[in-house]
């Protein structure tokens, strides 16, 4: 018969503790993606408006971004993150509400930076929508 050696081989995964993190908020017109990383850029947690249960046009609401930020923030709290630096990219409606949600969770926000890429007259933009 096979022996059950599971007790000696199984090791509990040790979570690293990180005191400072960087929040990358990518707010597009259709969705909001929130990623919390450590200082080196290794992802600790992430959440999206679509992953939070919102589909279609409800993904592009400030409330959906708030729910996604709360979900990512709760996982980051398990890593021991206390201070956050926020980097916001994109013109979407979830820019401000995601920062407010992280602030309400008890994180100390050290800085808020807008890192939206702006072309110096690079590629031609898409044609205007005619509705």
Swiss-Prot record:
What processes in GO biological process is this protein linked to? Answer: translation
Family annotation (InterPro entries): Ribosomal_uS11, Ribosomal_uS11_bac-type, Ribosomal_uS11_CS, Ribosomal_uS11_sf
The molecular function terms of the Gene Ontology recorded here are: rRNA binding; structural constituent of ribosome
In terms of SUPFAM superfamilies, this protein maps to: Translational machinery components (SSF53137)
Question: Which Gene3D superfamilies did the record assign?
Answer: Ribosomal protein S11 (3.30.420.80)
Q: What's an example GO cellular component term for this entry?
A: ribonucleoprotein complex
- Which domain of life does the protein's organism represent? Bacteria
Which UniProt keywords are listed? Ribonucleoprotein, Ribosomal protein, RNA-binding, rRNA-binding
Q: Name one Pfam family in it.
A: Ribosomal_S11
Q: Quaternary structure?
A: Part of the 30S ribosomal subunit. Interacts with proteins S7 and S18. Binds to IF-3.
State the function annotated in the UniProt record: Located on the platform of the 30S subunit, it bridges several disparate RNA helices of the 16S rRNA. Forms part of the Shine-Dalgarno cleft in the 70S ribosome.
| Family statement drawn from the similarity comment of this UniProt entry | Belongs to the universal ribosomal protein uS11 family.
**Name of the protein in its database record:** Small ribosomal subunit protein uS11
Instruction: Name the species this protein comes from.
Output: Neisseria gonorrhoeae (strain ATCC 700825 / FA 1090)
């Amino acid at each position: 018969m096979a022996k059950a050696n599971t007790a000696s081989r199984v090791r509990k995964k040790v979570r690293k503790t990180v005191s400072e993190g960087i929040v990358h908020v990518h707010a597009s017109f259709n969705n909001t993606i929130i990623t919390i990383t450590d200082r080196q850029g290794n992802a600790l947690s992430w959440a999206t408006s679509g992953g939070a249960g919102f589909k279609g046009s409800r993904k592009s609401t400030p409330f959906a971004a708030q729910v996604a930020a709360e979900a990512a923030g709760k996982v980051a709290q398990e890593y021991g993150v206390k201070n956050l630096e926020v980097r916001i990219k994109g013109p979407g409606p979830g820019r401000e509400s995601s920062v407010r949600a992280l602030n309400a969770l008890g994180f100390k926000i050290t800085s808020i930076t807008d890192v939206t890429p702006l072309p110096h007259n690079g590629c031609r933009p898409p044609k205007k929508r005619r509705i």
